Amino acid sequence: MQKQRNLYSLGLEEHDRLNKELGGGIPRGSIVLMEGDYGAGKSAISQRMAYGFCQEDATVTFLSTELTVSGFLDQMNSLSYDVVEHLLHERMLFLHADIDTGGVLSGSDENEGRMDLLTRLMEAETMWSADVVIIDTFDAVLRNDPTFEALIRQNEERQAALEIISFFRDLISEGKVIVLTVDPSTVDGEAIGPFRSIADVFLELEMIEVGNDVRRQISVMRFAGMGEQVGDTVGYSVRSGTGIVIESRSVA
């Protein structure tokens, strides 16, 4: 496995320049927070990361609150990221968190359904056995967790975040990487604040209008333990049949 300087390489060096732009990979033992509004590209970047990690022989768990297995396969195929072999050989585990409007995981019986989402996730040992765990989107889990919501209403945001952060810290002490995607417009800033504070890598995904063109960029807010130098911004686009494309831009 390629772990130069204790990094998990994002691979695909001949496909795009994402790994190079992010300093050669994600440091082992990191919490990665990726924020962006709806449509900013959080899912596409996290899917690219997942595929790249697997191509470099890391194991990945990908939990999606939006895509089913078939939807995930269709999406990855449209980006030319063929994950079928990785799934079949158990290098990748895909999980769909079917969160219904009642704030419980669908398919659970009544007693199980009353259990807190975060508690159920933390107790799902198989999910956390991979080298890299990606939760897309983490804000959907927070919004639908009854205990978390109750503490937020009591202005106990930090207490609400404390248990899950402690759990994450235990995992990254084993060298694992946890990637969380968040739409900041859907969750209170005070609730997400503690996660921003403890993130080793904090990326903001933005859409910027330039004339009639909408450009996407990754703003690197924090990147602890980087390999090579990481720039402040990385321009990119998402292209069907190609996937993530890193773009060099000059704004006149």
Model-predicted segments: where are they?
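Conserved inter-motif catalytic segment of the P-loop NTP-binding fold
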Residues: 58-143, 147
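A short acidic, often aromatic-flanked loop/helix-cap motif at beta-alpha or helix-coil junctions
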Residues: 99-105, 211-212, 243-244, 252
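Hydrophobic/aromatic beta-strand patches that form the interior of the parallel beta-sheet core
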Residues: 32-34, 61-63, 93-95, 179, ...
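Phosphate-binding/switch region of NTP-binding enzymes
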Residues: 176-240
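C-terminal regions of RecA-like/P-loop NTPase motor modules
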Residues: 1-6, 226-252
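The Walker A/P-loop phosphate-binding site
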Residues: 1-79
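Structural signal for conserved beta-strand scaffold positions within catalytic alpha/beta enzyme cores
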Residues: 94-96, 204, 220-222, 246-248
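P-loop NTPase motor core
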Residues: 113-114, 118-197
